[in-house]
Amino acid sequence: MSEQNTNHESPEQNVAHDNIEHSDSILEETMKEFDPQHNSGEEMTIENEIDLDTFKARIAELEGEVKEAKEGTARANAEAYDAQKRMEQEADKSKKFALQKFARELLEIVDNLERAIENADANDPVAEGVQLTHKALLAVLHKNGIEVVDPQGEKFNADLHEAVDIDAEAEADTVGTVLQKGYSLNGRLLRPAMVRVGQ
């Protein structure tokens, strides 16, 4: 009798046994699902999915940082280029106009030489020497970017000319007499010409 009991399980025992087997198979499937070695190809575990999302987020973050770094480098390069250009322009301006004060003082010498030439006797050998000196000085000034502004007969320009009197014989708004020549340094006015202007 006891042998029959051991060989034949009751219906309740069969159900319990089936339930245990079913639970074991579910557990085994669940373990396989979370086992990275078991999952390959298109199968994804929740854990792997979480890791992949984290990984993608980190990649996006790093790409953003790289983009910011590239933009920062481009801005820094542009600023450095602009600064270099500004320095070159400033150096160029300094070269062009460093002699401005010195040149103005030289103009007084030119004026004195011109007055001496006007008042000298044409046959005087000293006057000839003064003329040669005047010519040589003007050549040096020209070589260094200093040009004569002699507006005789031109339209009056307040930016280039200084009107000190009226010339009754000249046409209206026209320079009649140049009392003192003007000069420019590399295209920039160094001294305006003193003139008489027609009304």
Swiss-Prot record:
InterPro entries: GrpE, GrpE_coiled_coil, GrpE_head
Signal sequence, renumbered to the chain: none
Biased composition (Basic and acidic residues): 18-27
Keyword flag Chaperone: yes
This protein's record includes keyword Metal-binding: no
Cell compartments where the protein resides: Cytoplasm
CDD domains (UniProt xref): GrpE
Alphabetized UniProt keyword annotations: Chaperone, Cytoplasm, Stress response
Annotated segments matching region Disordered: 1-27
GO BP annotations listed: protein folding
GO CC annotations on file: cytosol
Primary localisation category: cytoplasm
Pfam families cross-referenced by the UniProt entry: GrpE (PF01025)
PROSITE patterns, sorted: GRPE
GO molecular function, one term: adenyl-nucleotide exchange factor activity
Assembly: Homodimer.
Sequence similarity: Belongs to the GrpE family.
Biological role stated in the UniProt entry: Participates actively in the response to hyperosmotic and heat shock by preventing the aggregation of stress-denatured proteins, in association with DnaK and GrpE. It is the nucleotide exchange factor for DnaK and may function as a thermosensor. Unfolded proteins bind initially to DnaJ; upon interaction with the DnaJ-bound protein, DnaK hydrolyzes its bound ATP, resulting in the formation of a stable complex. GrpE releases ADP from DnaK; ATP binding to DnaK triggers the release of the substrate protein, thus completing the reaction cycle.
Protein name: Protein GrpE
Organism in which the protein naturally occurs: Psychrobacter sp. (strain St1)
